[in-house]
C-alpha cells in the first residue's frame, strides 16, 4: 500500500502542478475539492495534506474553507497561497486585504531555521540573510499569526510570507513552490513530503500502468471502445495503454479533418497498423470539417465546431460496432484545467479544449480518459514504459483541432496548405540543426545540451498563419502576400512556458526557406511571448 498525500483544491489554475511535484518525488497523491466531507478525509487516510491556492479571497468567501478533519487528523499540513490564508483564519490568525498586491517574481527572506526551509536558499544578502527566488500571486495577506505559529518567511510588502507551527507539523507559504519560477520550490515540496511527512518514495510509472490497466478493464468489461487517433503523443499513449488492457476490444478511428500536419496520415497508419498491430479505421472527413468551419472566425466557436464534428464522426463509426459503448480520448491535465474542468470545477476557464469543451451532454457513448490525471512529461514516461518508439513518444504536442487553431480567423483549405508547408520547413530545420558550443557560450543552451537537435531542445514548435498581407519584394517585382509566425517554447509541464531562444542563424534559414519555397508567403515573424501572459497556442 502506497503512502498518500491529499491535495485539497480551492480553485487554483496550478493545483495540478502540486500533484506533479509530489509525483516527481515518487509519492502517490490525489486532488480533491476543498469541500469534501470530514469522513472522506479520514477514510482517505493521508500521510499529509496540502492546501492549494485560489483566485478567491479568504475574507470575501467565507465558505471556501478546509474541512475540520484536516486539523483533527494529526498529520502534517502545508498551505500554499490561499491555503496559507485559510489556515491562518481557521486556526485563529488574521487575514486582510493587501495594499500592495504581488503577482510575479519576488525575493523572500527565510526566517527561523524551520524544518521546511532549513539550508534551502538561493542567495545571501550582504547582511547574511538567506533569500529565496519565488513566484507570488496574491491580493490578501496574513496580518496576524495564529496561536502557536512562528514567522518563517517575509518580504517588504508581505511581512508574513511564511509561517510554521512545527509542534503540529503545520507549514504555510504565501508564494507558489509548485511552479518552476520558484527556484527551490521542488526541493521545498520534497522536504515536506519525504522529510516532514515521512512518505516512502515508492510510486513509479509501472505501478500506474498496472493500476490504469486494471481500472480500464473494470470500467469497460467486455464492451468495445473507439478512440480518436490524431497521431499526437496523448492519443498515441492512450491507445497503447487501452490496447494493453483490452486488446482488440479497441478500435482506433483516425479522422483526417483537413487540418493535419504534412504527411500525418501516412505516419499514423505506419505507426499503429505496422507497429502496434491495432485496429485502425481511416476516415477522410476534410470536406465535412472545412464546410462547417466556413465563415467562422471566433476561436472558441472553431474549437466547439471541431469537437462537435469529431463526436459525430465517432458516433457514426460506433454504430458500425455493435458493442461499442465507450469513446476514449487522450485528455491530459492541462487540457482539463484550462477548460475549468478539474475535479473541483472551480478553476477559471481560459479556453475550451476540443476534448472536454466540445462534447455535448447528449453523447451516446461513455467517456474513457485514462490520461486525465497526467501531465505531458508523465505521458511521455508512460509511453516509454509501454514500449512505444521514441519518435512517437517524444514528438511535439499537436492540438486536437489541428491547424484550425493555428490559422487565425476563418479556416480555409488554401490557408491550411500554406501553413502545412511552412510548418514542415520549420520542424525540418529544428531537427537537423544541432546546438553548438557557441550556442552554449551565448547562453542559448546548457553545455550538456551541445550536440542535441533544437527540436529536442524545444518542448513545442510550430508555425501560425496570420490572415493579413504585407508588401514584399521578390526579384524585381512587388509582392503582397501572407505572414506566418514561428512559435517555439520550452517547458516541463505546459502549465507555464518560456519562449525558446533559438539561434539567429537557424531562424534566418527558416525564414529564407519559407519565403522562397512557399508561394503565397512573404514575411516570417518569431513569437517571443511566455506563458503566462500568453497561451502556447495562439487560439
Swiss-Prot record:
Please provide, alphabetically and separated by semicolons, the GO molecular function terms listed in this UniProt record.
ATP binding; GMP synthase activity
Q: Name one GO cellular component term.
A: cytosol
**What InterPro entries does this protein's entry cite?**
Class_I_gatase-like (IPR029062), GATASE (IPR017926), GMP_synth_C (IPR001674), GMP_synth_GATase (IPR004739), GMP_synthase (IPR022955), GMPS_ATP_PPase_dom (IPR025777), NAD/GMP_synthase (IPR022310), Rossmann-like_a/b/a_fold (IPR014729)
Q: List the Pfam families hit by this protein, alphabetically.
A: GATase, GMP_synt_C, NAD_synthase
Instruction: Tell me which EC number(s) this protein carries.
Output: 6.3.5.2
Q: Where is the active site?
A: 81 (nucleophile), 176, 178
Sorted keywords for this record are: ATP-binding, Glutamine amidotransferase, GMP biosynthesis, Ligase, Nucleotide-binding, Purine biosynthesis
Q: Give start and end of each GMPS ATP-PPase domain.
A: 203-395
The reactions it catalyses are:
XMP + L-glutamine + ATP + H2O = GMP + L-glutamate + AMP + diphosphate + 2 H(+)
Q: What class does this enzyme belong to in the EC scheme?
A: ligase
Q: Where does ATP bind?
A: 230-236
Residue ranges annotated as transmembrane are none
Residues of the Glutamine amidotransferase type-1 domain:
4-202
Q: In which pathway does it act?
A: Purine metabolism; GMP biosynthesis; GMP from XMP (L-Gln route): step 1/1
Q: What does this protein do?
A: Catalyzes the synthesis of GMP from XMP.
**Subunit structure, as described in the record:** Homodimer.
Q: What is this protein called?
A: GMP synthase [glutamine-hydrolyzing]
- Tell me the organism: Cupriavidus necator (strain ATCC 17699 / DSM 428 / KCTC 22496 / NCIMB 10442 / H16 / Stanier 337) (Ralstonia eutropha)
Amino acid at each position: 500500500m502506497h503512502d498518500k498525500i491529499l491535495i485539497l483544491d480551492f480553485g487554483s489554475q496550478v493545483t495540478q502542478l502540486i500533484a506533479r511535484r509530489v509525483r516527481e518525488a515518487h509519492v502517490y497523491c490525489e486532488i480533491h475539492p476543498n469541500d469534501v466531507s470530514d469522513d472522506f478525509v479520514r477514510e482517505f487516510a493521508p500521510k499529509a495534506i496540502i492546501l492549494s491556492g485560489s483566485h478567491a479571497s479568504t475574507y470575501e468567501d467565507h465558505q471556501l474553507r478546509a474541512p475540520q478533519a484536516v486539523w483533527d487528523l494529526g498529520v502534517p499540513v502545508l498551505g500554499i497561497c490561499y491555503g496559507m490564508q485559510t489556515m491562518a483564519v481557521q486556526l485563529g490568525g488574521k487575514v486582510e486585504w493587501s495594499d500592495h498586491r504581488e503577482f510575479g517574481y519576488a525575493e523572500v527572506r527565510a526566517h527561523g531555521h524551520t524544518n521546511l526551509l532549513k539550508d534551502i536558499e538561493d542567495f545571501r544578502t550582504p547582511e547574511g540573510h538567506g533569500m529565496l527566488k519565488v513566484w507570488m500571486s496574491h491580493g490578501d495577506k496574513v496580518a496576524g499569526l495564529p496561536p502557536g505559529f512562528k514567522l518563517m518567511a517575509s518580504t517588504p510588502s508581505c511581512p508574513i510570507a511564511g509561517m510554521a507551527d512545527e509542534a503540529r507539523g503545520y507549514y504555510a507559504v504565501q508564494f507558489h513552490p509548485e511552479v518552476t519560477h520558484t527556484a527551490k520550490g521542488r526541493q521545498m515540496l520534497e522536504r515536506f513530503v519525504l522529510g516532514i511527512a515521512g512518505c516512502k518514495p515508492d510510486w513509479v510509472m509501472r505501478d500506474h500502468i498496472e493500476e490504469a490497466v486494471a481500472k480500464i478493464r473494470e470500467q469497460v468489461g467486455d464492451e468495445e471502445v473507439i478512440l480518436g487517433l490524431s497521431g499526437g503523443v496523448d492519443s498515441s499513449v492512450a491507445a497503447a495503454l487501452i490496447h494493453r488492457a483490452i486488446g482488440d476490444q479497441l478500435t482506433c478511428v483516425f479522422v483526417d479533418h483537413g487540418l493535419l500536419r504534412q504527411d500525418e496520415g501516412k505516419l499514423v497508419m505506419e505507426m499503429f497498423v505496422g507497429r502496434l498491430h491495432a485496429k485502425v479505421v481511416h476516415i477522410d472527413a476534410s470536406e465535412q470539417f472545412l464546410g462547417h468551419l466556413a465563415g467562422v472566425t471566433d476561436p472558441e466557436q472553431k474549437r466547439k465546431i471541431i469537437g462537435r464534428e469529431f463526436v459525430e464522426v465517432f458516433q457514426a463509426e460506433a454504430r458500425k460496432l455493435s458493442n461499442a459503448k465507450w469513446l476514449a480520448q487522450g485528455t491530459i491535465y492541462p487540457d482539463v484545467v484550462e477548460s475549468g474542468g478539474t475535479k473541483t470545477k472551480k478553476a477559471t476557464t481560459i479556453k475550451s479544449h476540443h476534448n472536454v469543451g466540445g462534447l455535448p451532454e447528449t453523447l451516446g457513448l461513455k467517456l474513457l480518459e485514462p490520461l486525465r490525471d497526467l501531465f505531458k512529461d508523465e505521458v511521455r514516461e508512460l509511453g516509454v514504459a509501454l514500449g512505444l518508439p521514441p519518435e512517437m513518444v517524444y514528438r511535439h504536442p499537436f492540438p486536437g483541432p489541428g491547424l484550425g487553431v493555428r490559422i487565425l480567423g476563418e479556416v480555409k483549405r488554401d490557408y491550411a496548405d500554406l501553413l502545412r508547408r511552412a510548418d514542415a520547413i520549420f520542424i525540418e530545420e529544428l531537427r537537423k540543426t544541432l546546438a553548438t558550443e557557441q550556442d552554449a557560450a551565448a547562453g542559448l543552451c546548457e553545455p550538456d545540451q551541445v550536440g542535441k537537435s533544437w527540436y529536442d531542445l524545444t518542448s513545442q514548435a510550430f508555425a501560425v498563419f496570420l490572415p493579413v498581407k504585407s508588401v514584399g519584394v521578390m526579384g524585381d517585382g512587388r509582392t503582397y502576400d501572407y505572414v506566418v509566425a514561428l512559435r517555439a517554447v520550452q517547458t516541463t509541464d505546459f502549465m507555464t512556458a518560456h519562449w525558446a531562444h533559438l539561434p539567429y542563424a537557424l531562424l534566418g534559414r527558416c525564414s529564407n526557406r519559407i519565403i522562397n519555397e512557399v508561394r503565397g508567403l512573404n514575411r516570417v515573424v518569431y513569437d517571443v511571448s511566455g506563458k503566462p501572459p500568453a497561451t502556447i497556442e495562439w487560439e
